[in-house]
């Protein structure tokens, strides 16, 4: 697998709509950086958040997830409570080519503050807004800034197109829009 360059990412965004909206140059003045980088794309977090709450003392169960475990917030600055968790989504909508796998890494600006972002790989043929998982590992409240960089996506090209893509097997998160909760 080869990691794909800024030239390839730009061309795929222009000709295949791989990333929409697409920011051609990295923006970093007065904000957490986002946009095209040398070998990746720094995506922004949208102002739509679901913050874990324990008001009803429920149990988190991925097979029977209760949406009441979250408080919804639309805001430019999301405050995640100490040792807590929030879901969000990217501003960008992604369409992944059949011969590409995308992995995500957190931004060092957030990681150095104890805020970890997690995203599972974007599989060949998948498309949608990416649901972002933010963990505040600190004993203090933490801020996440909407419309600024949240994570970096790295694009890996396989040696040939896959036999069965995410779209072919009708994956459960195909075409997701907004913050998407766990599905079984």
From Swiss-Prot:
Pfam hit, one: DCD
Pathway annotation from the record: Pyrimidine metabolism; dUMP biosynthesis; dUMP from dCTP (dUTP route): step 1/2
Assigned EC number: 3.5.4.13
Active-site residues, record numbering mapped to chain: 133
Binding site for dCTP: 107-112, 131-133, 152, 166, 176
Catalytic activity: dCTP + H2O + H(+) = dUTP + NH4(+)
Record-linked Gene3D superfamilies: 2.70.40.10
Any one GO BP annotation for this protein: dUMP biosynthetic process
Keywords assigned: Hydrolase, Nucleotide metabolism, Nucleotide-binding
GO molecular function annotations of the record: dCTP deaminase activity; nucleotide binding
InterPro entries documented for this protein: dCTP_deaminase, dUTPase-like_sf, dUTPase_trimeric
Top-level EC class as recorded in UniProt: hydrolase
Disulfide partners: none
Purpose: Catalyzes the deamination of dCTP to dUTP.
HAMAP family the UniProt entry points to: dCTP_deaminase (MF_00146)
UniProt-listed NCBIfam families: dCTP_deam (TIGR02274)
Family membership noted in the UniProt record: Belongs to the dCTP deaminase family.
Subunit structure: Homotrimer.
UniProt protein name: dCTP deaminase
Lineage per the UniProt record: Bacteria, Pseudomonadati, Pseudomonadota, Alphaproteobacteria, Sphingomonadales
């Amino acid at each position: 697998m080869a990691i794909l360059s800024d030239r390839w990412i730009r061309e795929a965004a222009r000709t295949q709509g791989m990333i929409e909206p697409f920011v051609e140059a990295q923006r970093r003045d007065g904000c957490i950086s986002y946009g095209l980088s040398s070998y990746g794309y720094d995506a922004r977090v949208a102002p739509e958040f679901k913050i874990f709450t324990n008001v009803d003392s429920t149990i988190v169960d991925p097979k029977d997830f209760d949406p009441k475990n979250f408080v919804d917030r639309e805001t430019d600055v999301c405050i995640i409570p100490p040792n807590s968790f929030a879901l969000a989504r990217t501003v960008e909508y992604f369409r992944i080519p059949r011969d590409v796998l995308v992995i995500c890494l957190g931004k060092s600006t957030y990681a150095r503050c104890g805020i970890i972002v997690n995203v599972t790989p974007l599989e060949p043929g998948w498309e949608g807004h990416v649901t972002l998982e933010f963990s505040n590992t600190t004993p203090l409240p933490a801020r996440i800034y909407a419309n600024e960089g949240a994570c970096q996506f790295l694009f890996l090209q396989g040696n040939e197109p896959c036999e069965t893509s995410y779209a072919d097997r009708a994956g459960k998160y195909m075409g997701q829009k907004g913050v998407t909760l766990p599905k079984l």
